[in-house]
Structure formats: C-alpha cells, structure tokens
Amino acid sequence: MSIEVNNESAIAADEAKLQRLAGYTFDIMHVHPDAELAILLVDEAAMEQLHVQWMDEPGPTDVLSFPMDELRPGTEDEPSPAGLLGDVVLCPQVAQVQAETTGHTLMDELLLLMTHGILHLLGFDHAEPAEEREMFGIQRDILVGFARYDRQH
C-alpha cells in the first residue's frame, strides 16, 4: 500500500503514526494492499481556500476528503480493487482548537479526523441519523482497535 503524508503546516505531527493508522484502517476495511492514499496537513489559509473552492463554505475546516477511484470497503475474501483511494486534507490548527475543547491531544484529534476522512473516501457519510450511527461506530471501533494494536507493536 502507498500511504504518503505531507505536512505543509507549521505544526509538527507524528507522520509515522498517521501512516500506521491509515494502514490499519485499510486492513480493517479490507482495502486492497496496493491502494494509494495521500494525507496532507495544511495551515488555516490553505484549508479555508479548499473549503471555499470545493464546499462553498467560508472559513477553514478540520478535514476534507477528495475521493479518486471511488473504492469501497471489501471483505476478507474479496478486498476492494487496487486503485487510488484519494486525498485526506487535515488542518492541525483547527484540530488543535477541537482537541482543547474535547480534552484530548492534538494527535488524538488528527487520528480521529484522518479516520473520518478515510471513511468518507470509502463512501461513508453522516447526513442521515442512521448513516451517522454507522459511520461513527466504525470510526470508534477503528480508533479503539488501533490504540490496542499500536501499543502492542
């Protein structure tokens, strides 16, 4: 699998941990091992520009996802096809404010946001209550499982 992390923000982040979580998420969601993902960390100005351009919304946001080949989760017997999953763009400055509000670390917030972004790339959404329950449940399960996995490795 190809997971590229590019930090263009002024805030340091554990890029290796972001890559490990992305790989773990690929495994859990049965994404083909040759799938490609780009993770980009940008400052508030760059995120605001993307948010306006692609979502027609003012101000910076925490995470944006840009799907490419519209890959979907696979199964253990039949993983998703290989392809370009897409890009997840994170804004550490916005994430920092959210982390302080919720009482956890910036890195925990970035891990949550990246998982959220990958799930969007895999076709999950949270526009409707049932979709939200499903997506957020999967997101929680991935993060809890990854915390255990990462401690053991």
From Swiss-Prot:
Keyword vocabulary terms for this entry: Cytoplasm, Endonuclease, Hydrolase, Metal-binding, Nuclease, Ribosome biogenesis, rRNA processing, Zinc
Cofactor details (free text): Binds 1 zinc ion.
Gene: ybeY
Species this protein is from: Leifsonia xyli subsp. xyli (strain CTCB07)
Transmembrane regions: none
The protein, known as: Endoribonuclease YbeY
InterPro entries on file: MetalPrtase_cat_dom_sf_prd (IPR023091), YbeY (IPR002036), YbeY_CS (IPR020549)
Main location: cytoplasm
Residues annotated for Zn(2+) binding in this entry: 116, 120, 126
